[in-house]
Curated annotation (Swiss-Prot):
It is found in: Cytoplasm. The keyword Metal-binding applies. One of its GO terms (molecular function) is thiolester hydrolase activity. Induction: By heat shock. Keywords: Cytoplasm, DNA damage, DNA repair, Hydrolase, Metal-binding, Stress response, Zinc. PANTHER family: PROTEIN/NUCLEIC ACID DEGLYCASE DJ-1-RELATED, PROTEIN_NUCLEIC ACID DEGLYCASE 1. This is Protein/nucleic acid deglycase HchA. Its main location: cytoplasm. The keyword Electron transport does not apply. Zn(2+) binds at residues 86, 91, 123. InterPro entries: Class_I_gatase-like (IPR029062), HchA (IPR017283), Prot/Nucl_acid_deglycase (IPR050325). Belongs to the peptidase C56 family. HchA subfamily.
Amino acid sequence: MTVQKSKNPQVDIAEDNAFFPSEYSLSQYTSPVSDLDGVDYPKPYRGKHKILVIAADERYLPTDNGKLFSTGNHPIETLLPLYHLHAAGFEFEVATISGLMTKFEYWAMPHKDEKVMPFFEQHKSLFRNPKKLADVVASLNADSEYAAIFVPGGHGALIGLPESQDVAAALQWAIKNDRFVISLCHGPAAFLALRHGDNPLNGYSICAFPDAADKQTPEIGYMPGHLTWYFGEELKKMGMNIINDDIAGRVHKDRKVLTGDSPFAANALGKLAAQEMLAAYAG
């Protein structure tokens, strides 16, 4: 007899009134191994250009009923794109708004993945000891070695990044200096940092996690309540076009902005980003 997994969010005892996703939702949307494949870059980049990862530094996201969702950056959405980019020859640095450590949704970590987990262990210190984004921004100029800015997904991207002037400055620098911007799922919420000033992403098309899907996740206990705002609605108000209305592992390229719709797009986005960056920097 099959026992139905619970759809009740699981208590996170590290914080008052905080919750992890339900057993049922984890069984549907996480896996102990990833879908990493196609990592084949026979002529990797050998230069000095690298990736700047803007990571989440806050774990708890308030929902409409006062309960907190225990979140952070999604491991698959973070590590698979970086795995491809690293294999293609691009090193990376990590920055957070505060300079404090990256928060991960460890409940989504592919802990039995024989490629992703060693990669994570190899680079864990970068996530534990990130740069402070303001310090990075202060040093940016036309000759800076960052070839791309990567904003991973996970609901942690909804906390702080959309209001950060440092995030806005980093994105403005990237677009104006012909660098790549890479993001997926909830990561594009960081683009909202541009909405109150100079917005070089006006008119761009992207893939992102649909608001409609976010509105459904509390039904299966993925979140302990509904979001208090929806980033897709806000991106559209600032002139961006979200081309997907479902979660199908879709990726999209608009000039040098490369995006994906969900963790199901992480591997494909990694391939796309590696191919595009090799063409630009190693061609």
